[in-house]
Regions:
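Extended, charge-rich helix/loop segments that form flexible
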Residues: 15-19, 117-206
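Short secondary-structure transition/capping segments
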Residues: 103-116, 150-164, 258-264, 286-302
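Gly/lys/ser-thr-rich phosphate-binding loops in alpha/beta enzymes
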Residues: 82-130
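Residues within well-ordered alpha-helices
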Residues: 50, 95, 196-199, 265
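Short, catalytically relevant binding-site loops at active-site mouths
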Residues: 115, 216-218
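C-terminal active-site subregion of NodB/CE4 polysaccharide deacetylases
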Residues: 1-83, 90, 120-139, 205, ...
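CE4/NodB-like, metal-dependent polysaccharide N-deacetylase domain
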Residues: 25, 75-76, 88, 93-109, ...
Length: 320
């Protein structure tokens, strides 16, 4: 048996359909070219290869259809859906043409507050480290001293340390600290990393699904309940105003069950009238409001498909 029929047969065993075996892939960026600083990031060539695997080995469904078929128990074998988080401009500029060439559908979960010239805090950190003309970065105000940036490895280590240090800080404190990092770097930070409203409309006009991802991408578990609910509702309302269509799906920011969102947030998603929601937990699950997502990191097409199959062999974590 050749690799492709073997892979399809294996996937049919672990993803038999009905109410089991939906693979949901999650992407963030699709770069036009490989990034020398972060070579593991997905670029157009790698994304195209992964789409070929998806088209050949899976039954790729729009996520709303996949949810409806999970609910009715009619999911086909080897079912999969493709999603993107945050709202990067390259989703429309780079990923959309590749999806359309292959007749594939994706859902784009957009954090509405960063559209039209905004930049997420983590990207400010990444670009400050990437573009600084300096060989060191003084981060004594964070309690981590001076970071050495003379090599790509040093820059990668600095980014990892800074993101880990800042991730769970209160939103306003984090914004102030990130601004200090940007100033200390002396870098000219890029604009245009995130989509414009026109690009969101372009995705919608192309038949892609637009999903809510809050306004400011906060970690919901750190917010008072009314603020968390407001982030969910306002993000949805902003996207509906942009597209003129209904926003039916939600993605929890950061998305780790029990850490980044809690059972109360699942209840909020239901109460707000969403049809379903997705997490970043790995594994298999069929709770329509806590659907896990996973994207293999393998460059080999066969290994990519096999790792997706393996991911479906154990249950995903849930907030409750």
């Amino acid at each position: 048996m050749s690799a492709r029929p073997f892979t399809r047969a294996l996937l049919s065993v672990v993803a038999p359909g009905g109410t089991r075996g939906l693979s949901i892939l999650v992407y963030h960026r699709v770069l036009p070219h490989a990034d020398p600083l972060f070579p593991a990031m997905v670029d157009a060539r790698r994304f195209a290869l992964q789409l070929e695997v998806m088209a050949r080995c899976f039954n790729v469904l729009p996520l709303p259809e996949a949810l409806a078929r999970l609910r009715s128990g009619t999911l086909p074998a080897r079912a999969a859906s493709i999603t993107f988080d945050d709202g990067y401009a390259d989703n429309e500029a780079v990923a959309l043409p590749l999806l359309r060439e292959r007749g594939l559908h994706a859902t784009f979960f957009v954090a509405a507050g960063f559209l039209d010239g905004g930049r997420m805090w983590n990207d400010t950190v990444i670009e400050a480290v990437r573009l600084t003309p300096r060989a060191t970065l003084d981060c004594g105000f964070l309690g981590i001293g001076q970071l050495t940036l003379a090599t790509p490895a040093g820059k990668r280590a600095a980014v990892d340390l800074l993101l880990g240090t800042l991730k769970y800080r209160p939103v306003h404190d984090r914004a102030e600290l990130v601004a200090r990092i940007a100033t200390a770097s002396g870098a000219a930070l890029p604009a245009g990393l995130m989509m414009t409203s026109a690009q969101v409309r372009s995705l919608h006009a192309a038949g892609m699904e637009i999903g809510a991802h809050t306004v400011n991408h906060p970690i919901l578990a750190t917010l008072p309940a009314p603020v968390a609910r407001g982030e969910m509702a306002s993000g949805r309302d902003a996207l509906e105003a942009i597209t003129g269509g209904k926003v039916r799906l939600f993605a929890y920011p950061n998305g780790k069950p029990g850490q980044d969102y809690l059972p109360e947030h699942v209840g909020m998603v239901r109460a707000l009238g969403f049809d379903g929601a997705v997490t970043t937990a790995w594994g298999a699950g069929n709770d329509l409001f806590q659907l896990p997502r996973f994207t293999p990191w393998d460059r080999s097409p066969l290994r990519f498909a096999l790792r997706l199959a393996h991911n479906l062999t154990y249950p995903a974590a849930q907030a409750a």
